[in-house]
């Protein structure tokens, strides 16, 4: 039987868990992990049929990308938000988050818990059109947030510090729309 209350409490932790990259770069009032996941889900929500085509020409499942965006960082509610600069290997990060997802999904009934775990695993494996697109959401949401921080009057001194976020994503987008949006955002920064 599902323990919905426990699951909802775990999800609630993401509302107050600040994104570590912004904290480490001295951003005032940094977004939460929940904020990040919400805008990613909205990215999936607003795409129309013509944009839901993968590199292989196959249709992308819209509902799946929305759900995947909502669960991709769920494990961080128990283990925290790691950055590439943390002293932890990718494999260690993966194992910590996998164990957290298992613990979290064990609070739900088998079918629902399995769906969440499978979505998370598909995102981590990054082999499907849906996972590749949600990875693009993840990267684009980050640089869009960096852009927004740079435009805030009290953050202007952070412009050089936030350049690394843009550098880390340059040339790494798969979907044509997000390749284009990333280039447009870079142009808007000038």
From Swiss-Prot:
Where is a divalent metal cation 1 annotated to bind?
A: 36, 72-73, 138
Q: So which cofactors does this thing need?
A: Mn(2+); Co(2+); Mg(2+)
Q: How is the cofactor bound?
A: Binds 2 divalent metal cations. Shows activity with Mn(2+), Co(2+) and Mg(2+) but shows no activity with Zn(2+).
Q: Does the keyword Thylakoid apply?
A: no
SUPFAM superfamilies to which the protein is assigned, alphabetical: HD-domain/PDEase-like
Which top EC class applies here?
A: hydrolase
Record-linked Pfam families: HD_3
Which sites bind a divalent metal cation 2? Answer: 76, 81
In what residue span(s) does the HD domain sit?
33-143
Q: Which EC numbers does the record give?
A: 3.1.3.89
- Which InterPro entries does this chain map to? HD/PDEase_dom, HD_domain, YfbR/HDDC2
Query: What is catalyzed by this enzyme?
Result: a 2'-deoxyribonucleoside 5'-phosphate + H2O = a 2'-deoxyribonucleoside + phosphate
A Gene Ontology MF term for this entry?
A: metal ion binding
Annotated signal sequence is none
Keywords, alphabetical: Cobalt, Hydrolase, Magnesium, Manganese, Metal-binding
Carries keyword Magnesium?
A: yes
Give the quaternary structure.
Answer: Homodimer.
State the family it belongs to. Answer: Belongs to the HDDC2 family.
Q: What name does UniProt use for this protein?
A: 5'-deoxynucleotidase HDDC2
Source organism per entry reads: Dictyostelium discoideum
